């Protein structure tokens, strides 16, 4: 036997290297085979519900790192709630209708207009489902736990029927109407867009300053006067039917020396405009308030058949332009509102593809709207005063990335204005985890217009509306419920397979159809109505869920998307928000803080992370960032997170190794019988338990990460485990001192494994497989630990807080001695302490081997004053010298009692007593050489 064999060197097969990329799929298959999700649900039956409703990602392509962050966050919450006394099911969902899938099929060569519509929709469905299953596998690879066999998909018959019923209730309440209002129109998609489907980019446009000649000045302006107008959309002049001024803005009538014409502009802008137009010696002839100009009539710049009326509008400002805007009610919301109020014609001169129509005039017909500037300039002639290129923020179609226009077309709308206050009141009852989130959603609802819910596409849920022979729209409770029932059985494709009459209830009649003939609507619903109905299609329809949900968790872009549409439909139907809490997340940026883009080549695919680091590192990264704001991710950042993971893993490996001979049923030492330092570590750990439990409850993942890493680095590695080897390696295997420390080790190991499970389930299960005395076969089936408090807890904490200050001072003294070459390692030191009474009392209260705690070979507490050369602090001073004696081959301390023993061992008296008591046979035979 060798002397080193008398040490209790921790042994474990738990590997230092995690091998996550190869091991994770093996564990995941084991969980699936063991039906862990179902077993967890069974354990939680009868417990209070906590329902996190999954916002459905769009089923197209593999998941990106933003998806991963969002879904890992959801998984952490679901797992922590499931282990905290809640029935927390997770039903994953997917959004499957809409233009992107049509675009994919088009790229694959599918020609929609050349094939049967039902066959086309079948192709859309097949593609969408293939993407659902692809993404499902992506999410499962992240280690997510959920009901993967009973997911929800917006294209299933039961879901589509539930969506129709949401629409039906809104129709019954009078919230659905048809109107020809200007809407965001995407010529690239040939469809109307909702606000949630647009994004803003900078765009360079040609702006024109031109003049309309007064035709009837109403006794205020002469007919040789021109009103100066500014526009950034020259094509809309073809549909201009008025000029709008601000009622309270001052306008001036001016005569430039170089002009025979007189002009009207906003007084505040005269100087800048004169410079722009090259006007010199400008004479101000008169000043008018905007309201005085109301109902003056001007000529259209070139269309002699059209007069343009001066009207008043609150949207006119003097921030730019001329303080006067031309008004084309068919091409803008403000224009429409003031135009309708003043009886202006709603002219639309651009078709669905962005091509100018015949009513724009022969010179414009057939041109693309954005290419007509030269023709407009030619038509304006000397009415054009200036032109310039401007860069401004402009709306784009979020899918095609092409600019859009406002365009008045007949559309179906869901009224928001009719119950806006009810929606705002519902927002006040929701808990937002960021105050700005509440403000953002509140302001969006307060300021938004009615919702355009019709789309001129094929792949989606049909609007369940019929038309009588006289054109009357039919959407009664009876007809809508009948359609819902048909969809429930056959799916929405039945709408296209049958004619209108066979989609209506048997024997249905309507006074507007004396011949019994009907037509059906061919528009489909906005996809935001699809996902916005999920509270009904999922929460209401599934017996193991609750409505409203406890939590909606999505990216911050969903304040104008899913949070918004779900809120409107839910309040419209039931008067309540579909969620009790909203938690939002920022976007994922690259390591430099730049937006991720395939074109920039700075994206990170979750699959690449899984291959290089493992999903566990991605999961740990999610907790290491403040996801309420935009967050950065790169392979370098993940490499740093991987180092943190390695530290966590190796610390827990040390605990596993050094409790391998510990049986909690036999070897646990009661708290009251622990040493003071062990009590301190037990209390500190339970403070960590409370911090983590509270943070899980509040979804504060970063708090968990910081607290955990700090505890491992500061409390364990830098202190408790730093001197632990002197106890667990050196002392007798069954000694009280060793069992005391092992009791703390085991308690921390078991509980920290449970606390880590929601974040690092793969690693937690790997650790759990080494804990043979724990009852549950999987840690995921256990409960999170409860924090304990102990008698005299504050007193113990105060004592050890003071000791940590003392320890820091001692370490400074040792460092000075090391720099002076007095010692090398701290174990070479004999530390003499010159304490005042406070420190002396402290060291007595610590009631531990202080030399061991400071990792020095010898320590003396001296009486009297410290020598002049001592390293002094306010309450204590230290001197450091090299310890006397020889290095013990067993404990490595320098000790005066170290000597060669008769059994061929050079060891100190303390080690000799341990060896002689526990290894009599080796002592009798003598130890082998090293």
Curated annotation (Swiss-Prot):
Disulfide bonds: none
Cofactor(s) the protein requires to work: Zn(2+)
Alphabetized PANTHER family for the sequence: ISOLEUCINE--TRNA LIGASE, MITOCHONDRIAL, SOLEUCYL-TRNA SYNTHETASE
Motif ('HIGH' region): 57-67
Similarity field: Belongs to the class-I aminoacyl-tRNA synthetase family. IleS type 1 subfamily.
Protein name as annotated: Isoleucine--tRNA ligase
Biological process terms in GO annotation: isoleucyl-tRNA aminoacylation
Subunit structure: Monomer.
Binding residues annotated for Zn(2+), in chain numbering: 888, 891, 908, 911
Role according to the record: Catalyzes the attachment of isoleucine to tRNA(Ile). As IleRS can inadvertently accommodate and process structurally similar amino acids such as valine, to avoid such errors it has two additional distinct tRNA(Ile)-dependent editing activities. One activity is designated as 'pretransfer' editing and involves the hydrolysis of activated Val-AMP. The other activity is designated 'posttransfer' editing and involves deacylation of mischarged Val-tRNA(Ile).
Source species: Streptococcus pneumoniae (strain P1031)
Its EC number(s): 6.1.1.5
Binding site for L-isoleucyl-5'-AMP: 554
PROSITE patterns: AA_TRNA_LIGASE_I (PS00178)
Compartment(s): Cytoplasm
């Amino acid at each position: 036997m060798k002397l080193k064999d008398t040490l209790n060197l921790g042994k474990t097969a738990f590997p230092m290297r995690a091998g996550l990329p190869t091991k994770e799929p093996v564990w995941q298959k084991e969980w699936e085979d063991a039906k862990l999700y179902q077993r967890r649900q069974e354990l939680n039956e009868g417990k209070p519900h906590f329902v996190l409703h999954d916002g459905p990602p769009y089923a197209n392509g593999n998941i990106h790192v933003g998806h991963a962050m969002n879904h890992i966050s959801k998984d952490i919450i679901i797992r922590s709630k499931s282990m905290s006394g809640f029935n927390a099911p997770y039903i994953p969902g997917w959004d499957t209708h809409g233009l992107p899938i049509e675009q994919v099929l088009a790229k694959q060569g599918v020609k929609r207009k050349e094939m049967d519509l039902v066959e086309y929709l079948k192709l859309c469905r097949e593609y969408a489902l293939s993407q659902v299953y692809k993404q499902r596998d992506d999410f499962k690879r992240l280690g997510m736990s959920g009901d993967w066999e009973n997911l929800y998909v917006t294209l299933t018959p039961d879901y589509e029927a539930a969506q129709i019923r949401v629409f039906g209730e809104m129709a019954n309440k009078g919230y659905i109407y048809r109107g020809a209002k200007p809407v965001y129109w995407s010529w690239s998609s040939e469809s109307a867009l909702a606000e949630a489907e647009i994004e803003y980019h900078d765009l360079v446009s040609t702006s024109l300053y031109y003049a309309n000649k007064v035709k009837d000045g109403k006794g205020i302006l002469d007919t040789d006067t021109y009103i100066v107008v500014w526009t950034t959309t020259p094509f809309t002049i073809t549909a201009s039917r008025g000029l709008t001024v601000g009622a309270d803005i001052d306008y001036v009538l001016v005569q430039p020396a170089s002009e025979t014409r007189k002009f009207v502009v906003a007084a505040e802008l005269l100087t800048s405009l004169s410079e722009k137009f090259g006007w010199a010696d400008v004479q101000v002839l008169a000043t008018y308030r905007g309201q005085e100009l109301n109902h003056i009539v001007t000529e259209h710049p070139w269309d002699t058949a059209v007069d343009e009326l001066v009207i008043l509008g609150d949207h006119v400002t003097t921030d730019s332009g001329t303080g006067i805007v031309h008004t084309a009610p068919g091409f803008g919301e403000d224009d429409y509102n003031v135009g309708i109020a003043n009886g202006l014609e709603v002219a639309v001169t651009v078709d669905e593809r962005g091509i100018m129509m015949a009513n724009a005039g022969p010179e414009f017909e057939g041109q693309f709207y954005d290419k007509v500037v030269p023709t407009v300039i030619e038509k304006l002639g000397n009415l054009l005063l200036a032109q310039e290129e401007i860069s401004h923020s402009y709306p784009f179609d979020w899918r095609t990335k092409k600019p859009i226009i406002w365009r008045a077309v007949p559309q179906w709308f869901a009224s928001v204005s009719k119950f806006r206050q009810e929606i705002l009141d519902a927002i006040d009852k929701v808990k937002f985890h960021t105050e700005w989130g509440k403000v953002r959603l509140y302001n969006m609802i307060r300021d938004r217009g009615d919702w355009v819910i019709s789309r001129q596409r094929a792949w989606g849920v049909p609007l369940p509306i019929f038309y009588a022979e006289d054109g009357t729209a039919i959407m009664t409770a009876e007809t809508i419920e009948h359609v819902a029932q048909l969809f429930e059985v056959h799916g929405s494709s039945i709408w296209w397979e049958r004619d209108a009459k066979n989609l209506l209830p048997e024997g249905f009649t309507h006074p507007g159809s004396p011949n019994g003939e009907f037509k059906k609507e061919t528009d489909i619903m906005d996809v935001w109505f699809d996902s916005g109905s999920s509270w009904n299609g999922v929460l209401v329809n599934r017996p193991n869920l609750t409505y409203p949900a406890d939590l909606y968790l999505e990216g911050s872009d969903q304040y104008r998307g899913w949070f918004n549409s779900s809120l409107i439909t839910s309040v419209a139907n039931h008067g309540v928000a579909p969620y009790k809490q909203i938690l939002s997340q920022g976007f994922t940026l690259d390591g430099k803080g730049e937006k991720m883009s395939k074109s920039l080549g700075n994206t990170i695919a979750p699959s690449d992370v899984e291959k290089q680091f493992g999903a566990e590192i991605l999961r740990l990264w999610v907790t290491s960032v403040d996801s309420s704001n935009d967050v950065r991710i790169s392979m370098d950042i993940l490499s740093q997170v991987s180092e943190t993971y390695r530290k966590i893993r190796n610390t827990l490996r040390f605990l596993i190794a050094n409790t391998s001979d510990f049986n909690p049923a036999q070897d646990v030492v009661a708290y009251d019988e622990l040493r003071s330092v062990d009590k301190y570590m037990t209390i500190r750990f339970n403070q960590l338990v409370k911090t983590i439990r509270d943070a899980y409850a509040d979804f504060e993942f970063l708090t968990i990460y910081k607290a955990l890493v700090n505890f491992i680095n500061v409390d364990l590695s830098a202190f408790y485990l730093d001197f632990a080897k002197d106890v667990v390696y050196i002392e007798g295997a069954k000694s009280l001192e060793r069992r005391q420390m092992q009791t703390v080790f085991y308690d921390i190991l078991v509980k920290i494994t449970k606390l880590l499970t929601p974040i690092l389930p793969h690693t937690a299960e790997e650790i759990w497989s080494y804990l043979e005395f724990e009852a549950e076969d999987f840690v995921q089936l256990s409960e999170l630990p409860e924090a304990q408090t102990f008698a005299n807890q504050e007193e113990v904490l105060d004592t050890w807080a003071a000791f940590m200050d003392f320890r820091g001072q001692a370490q400074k003294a040792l460092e000075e001695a090391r720099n002076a070459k007095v010692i090398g390692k701290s174990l070479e030191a004999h530390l003499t302490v010159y304490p005042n009474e406070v420190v002396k009392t402290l060291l007595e209260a610590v009631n531990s081997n202080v030399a061991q705690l400071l990792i020095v070979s010898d320590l003396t507490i001296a009486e009297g004053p410290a020598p002049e050369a001592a390293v002094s602090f306010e309450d204590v001073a230290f001197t450091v010298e090299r310890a006397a004696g020889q290095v013990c081959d067993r404990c490595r301390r320098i000790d005066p009692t170290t000597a060669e023993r008769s059994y061929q061992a050079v060891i100190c008296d303390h080690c000799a007593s341990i060896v002689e008591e526990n290894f009599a046979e080796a002592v009798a035979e003598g130890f082998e050489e090293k």
